């Protein structure tokens, strides 16, 4: 990998969302990414050109380990749903203009079903335009509602929490 990467978080802040971000960051650095940008508040933040250089915030192996255990969404999240491509081409043009400005080689989005929809739409638009940026979705959802998956990261944590809570209620009754 020779270019820059941008990563965002979207949807609910599950236990897996920051672990996924730590894994994306570490892998990108290990594979030679020049810069790893983080979208503040997901795709909505990117549309507002609100992003940070993660290497300024994650500087040591300890920072990566702490990020894995940090609650909530480190970059901030959103629930903004991209319009269909033909309904609002200007939105897509704006996103791709920002990606070009940052020289993004790979766009990574961590989230649930709507986040994977965002990745699909951006990937489809890149194909239509012949744009070289690669788009990758990192699934995490407590709802376990992603097509073609059995269990998504985040779902196991939610199921365990519910099971433990029910067990404690039974013991207290």
Q: Model-predicted segments: where are they?
A:
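Solvent-exposed alpha-helices and their adjacent loops that cap or buttress functional pockets
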Residues: 1, 6, 29-31, 65-69, ...
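N-terminal phosphate-binding or glycine-rich loops at protein starts, especially the Walker A/P-loop
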Residues: 1-52
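Short glycine-rich or small-residue beta-strand-to-loop segments that form or flank ligand, phosphate
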Residues: 4-14, 73-79, 105-111, 137
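Short, ordered loop/turn segments at secondary-structure junctions
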Residues: 10-12, 39-45, 79-80, 112-115, ...
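Short acidic, glycine/serine/threonine-rich loops at helix termini
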Residues: 17-20, 47-53, 86-87, 118-123, ...
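Short Gly/Thr/Asp-enriched flexible loops that form oxyanion-binding sites at enzyme active sites
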Residues: 19-24, 113-133
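Short, acidic/small-residue loops that bind anionic groups at enzyme active sites
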Residues: 36, 123-152, 156-161
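Glycine-rich oxoanion-binding loops at beta->alpha junctions
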Residues: 50-105, 114, 142, 151-162, ...
